[in-house]
From Swiss-Prot:
GO biological process annotation, one example: translation
HAMAP family according to UniProt: GatB
InterPro entries cross-referenced by the UniProt entry: Asn/Gln-tRNA_amidoTrfase_suB/E (IPR017959), Asn/Gln-tRNA_Trfase_suB/E_cat (IPR006075), Asn/Gln_amidotransferase (IPR018027), Asn/Gln_tRNA_amidoTrase-B-like (IPR003789), GatB (IPR004413), GatB_C_1 (IPR042114), GatB_Yqey_C_2 (IPR023168), Gln-tRNA_amidoTrfase_suB_CS (IPR017958)
Name of the protein: Aspartyl/glutamyl-tRNA(Asn/Gln) amidotransferase subunit B
Underlying gene: gatB
Organism placement in taxonomy: Bacteria, Pseudomonadati, Pseudomonadota, Gammaproteobacteria, Pseudomonadales
Organism: Pseudomonas aeruginosa (strain UCBPP-PA14)
Length: 481
């Protein structure tokens, strides 16, 4: 039997506000446990929440970016459940009247095609605290620094049909919230977490299968692995005569498997009701109109512009527009050197390799956009060859200065004097007289292979400084004379 996968994702994006959603406590990551929890966060009697306006602004920006309906009036609700790191015994969230309604996001698939994923809603809520198990023998500790941190929960429609599509969607959300400046997207620190709802059904069947939810997956790689494992688990279970149980599961990356955590709750289990401590939030059309003017160029728009304005391939444009910082870096380099394709190649290949090797983000690059743009100019004006440029790039990465300073200090300037190159070629050919005779006696096919040998010898003799184009032209004339 052929099976079809149905996936819906719930992404929790931690909003980049300075303070919490209902208190003035800091949201900074990494503080000592329980040093950033106010009386409101601790749910002390007599305290009342005050809504953070910046969180509302960020949620509205997101809604505008996904072309969603933003309700004029939205309401906070209490989601009731007991957990040790939830001091109030309920989480302040939104249920019937979320701040962001239906919208959509277009994702790019591996084959270059585009698919539209519906977004059901996005609502504001507060995060819970954190249970600590490793540092206490036979006990658990509670850190409430995270309690009250503002989250935007983004709920997709069940439009996703594979693990790779799911990763593409999460990457698109990740890029979007970073472009908007509403979330830093740091998955390792929990700033972006994903719950994956996965079910399978016979191909062609309209009715959904029973879904399982995989909680709190925090990397693109783990999202793909967790979903693929869950798909296989459900198919094998059904084909063996069993039934999928609606439940919440956890992904164990060490064993590459999901395991049952608890039975899946429905909305009724949480006994939602309007929060009596918070008035409805009214968002006027004029407020949204002003926010719309603040929207930056979004990832899809930037990718399309890179293709049309700079003539980049869809793949290159996609990579370079993946983050706002990467796109800005590329455009600075291009603005200096005036060659988009050379700039794209150096940013994606050489710089990308350097950053990956050292585990750095583009904003931590040891080579500035100004340095890289200046170096590419020296390739274009034939001051250095592409091979020498790699040496210059490495020196810039080691902090040895600008391209011009390094070229001067190391004597790397390309030899373009025809007379000097001819003299060097005569010496190379004289030292390889036997190979010259073999070349002249060979047919065209063999000559092509042998020509590379002479070019290599010439570049070796010039220590890579001779202009490759001139070497090729002059060498061909001499060998065929």
């Amino acid at each position: 039997m052929q099976w079809e996968t149905v996936i819906g994702l719930e992404i929790h994006a931690q909003l980049a506000t300075q303070s919490k959603i209902f208190s003035g406590s800091s949201t900074a990551f990494g503080a000592a446990p329980n040093t950033q929890a106010s009386l409101v966060d601790l749910a002390m009697p007599g305290t009342l929440p005050v809504l953070n306006e910046e969180a509302v602004r960020m949620a509205c920006l997101f809604g505008l970016a996904i072309d969603a309906r933003i309700d004029r009036q939205n309401v906070f609700a209490r989601k009731n459940y007991f957990y040790p790191d939830l001091p109030k015994g309920y989480q302040t969230s939104q249920m019937d009247h979320p701040i962001v309604g239906k919208g959509h996001l277009d994702i790019t698939l591996e084959d270059g095609t585009t698919k539209r994923i519906g977004i059901t809603r996005a609502h504001l809520e507060e995060d819970a605290g954190k249970s600590l198990h490793e540092d206490f023998q036979g006990m658990s500790g509670i850190d409430l620094n995270r309690a009250g941190t503002p989250l935007l929960e983004i709920v997709s429609e069940p439009d996703i049909r594979s693990a790779k599509e799911a990763v593409a969607y999460v990457k698109a959300i990740h890029a979007l919230v970073r472009y908007l400046g509403i979330c830093d997207g740091n998955m390792a620190e929990g700033s972006l977490r994903c719950d994956c709802n996965v079910s399978v059904r016979p191909k062609g069947q309209a009715e959904f299968g029973t879904r399982a939810e995989i909680k709190n997956v925090n990397s693109f790689r783990f999202i793909e692995k967790a979903i693929n494992h869950e798909i296989q688990r459900q198919i094998e279970l059904i084909e063996d005569g069993g039934k999928v149980v609606q439940e919440t599961r956890l992904y164990d990356p060490n064993k590459d498997e999901t395991r049952s955590m608890r039975g899946k709750e429905e909305a009724n289990d949480y006994r939602y009701f309007p929060c009596p401590d918070l008035l409805p939030v009214v968002i006027e059309p004029e407020y949204l109109a002003k926010l719309r003017e603040q929207l930056p160029e979004l990832p899809v728009q930037k990718r399309e512009r890179f293709e049309s304005q700079y003539g980049l391939s869809a793949y290159d444009a996609s990579v370079l527009s993946a983050s706002r910082e990467m796109a800005d870096y590329f455009e600075k380099v291009q603005g200096i050197c005036g060659d988009a394709k050379l700039a794209a190649n150096w940013v994606m290949v050489e710089l990308g390799s350097l950053l990956n090797k050292d585990g750095l983000e583009i904003e931590q690059s040891p080579v500035s956009a100004e340095q890289l743009g200046g170096m590419i100019l020296r390739i274009k004006d034939n001051t250095i060859s592409g091979k020498i440029a790699k040496m210059v790039f490495e020196a810039m990465a080691n902090g040895e200065g600008s391209a011009d300073q390094i070229i001067e200090a190391k004597g790397l300037k390309q030899v373009t004097d025809s007379g000097a190159i001819e003299k060097m070629l005569d010496e190379v050919l004289a030292a390889n007289a036997e190979q010259v005779e073999q070349y002249r006696a060979a047919d065209e096919a063999k000559r092509g292979k042998m020509f590379g040998f002479f070019v290599g010898q010439a570049m070796k003799a010039s220590k890579g400084k001779a202009n490759p184009q001139q070497v090729n032209e002059l060498l061909k004339k001499k060998l065929e004379a």
